[in-house]
Amino acid sequence: MASSLVSSFQPRSAFLGDRNVFKVSSTPFAQVGYSSKTIECKESRIGKQPIAVPSNVTIALEGQDLKVKGPLGELALTYPREVELTKEESGFLRVKKTVETRRANQMHGLFRTLTDNMVVGVSKGFEKKLILVGVGYRATVDGKELVLNLGFSHPVKMQIPDSLKVKVEENTRITVSGYDKSEIGQFAATVRKWRPPEPYKGKGVKYSDEIVRRKEGKAGKKK
């Protein structure tokens, strides 16, 4: 009886089978900070894309400092040490990682996008459109000020930066344009912030491509 029990006993590893096998990835890993953990450093799909430079755009690179000049204006950007910018013989720009870390991977895609926005901005420009929805809501441009009537007891006056152009059509359609995409977005967001669109009647300031999720009022729920 004892011998049969001994013969039927098997180590735990025999029951686990393939679960004891550890698979090792061939993808390179990098150490992060002082942590004992390792992470997989994946290549950024956005970061590895080349940047085309039009003939009317001038690129000046000194160390980690980049200056881009075009017919619409001039922009500057300083790169972190985790990434660097190189110019190929073909004329394309490439953003490359200098180290293999999680932060470098994040900076890779981010600074490729920022650099591309600079090149497009000084050559073609960007614009952002807003729409005023509401009875009595209107906008006008008075010199270097955007004047908004949004139902408050007094009009809202916003100073227009020198690098931006603001145009108003039909008193309710605002177009903000310029060569600095981040500045355009910030100015447009400030305009919208004065009266964000409310979900019941849709009144407020919204982006032209914004979809406002509508809610049913209390009166509609009782029916």
Curated annotation (Swiss-Prot):
Coiled coil: none annotated. One of its GO terms (molecular function) is structural constituent of ribosome. Residues 1-41 form a transit peptide. GO terms for cellular component: chloroplast; chloroplast envelope; chloroplast stroma; extracellular region; ribonucleoprotein complex; ribosome. The keyword Ribonucleoprotein applies. GO terms for biological process: embryo development ending in seed dormancy; translation. It comes from the Eukaryota. Keywords: Chloroplast, Plastid, Ribonucleoprotein, Ribosomal protein, RNA-binding, rRNA-binding, Transit peptide. InterPro entries: Ribosomal_uL6-like, Ribosomal_uL6-like_a/b-dom_sf, Ribosomal_uL6_a/b-dom, Ribosomal_uL6_bac-type, Ribosomal_uL6_CS. Signal peptide: none annotated. It is found in: Plastid, Chloroplast. NCBIfam families: L6_bact. Part of the 50S ribosomal subunit. This protein binds directly to 23S ribosomal RNA and is located at the aminoacyl-tRNA binding site of the peptidyltransferase center. Belongs to the universal ribosomal protein uL6 family. This is Large ribosomal subunit protein uL6c.
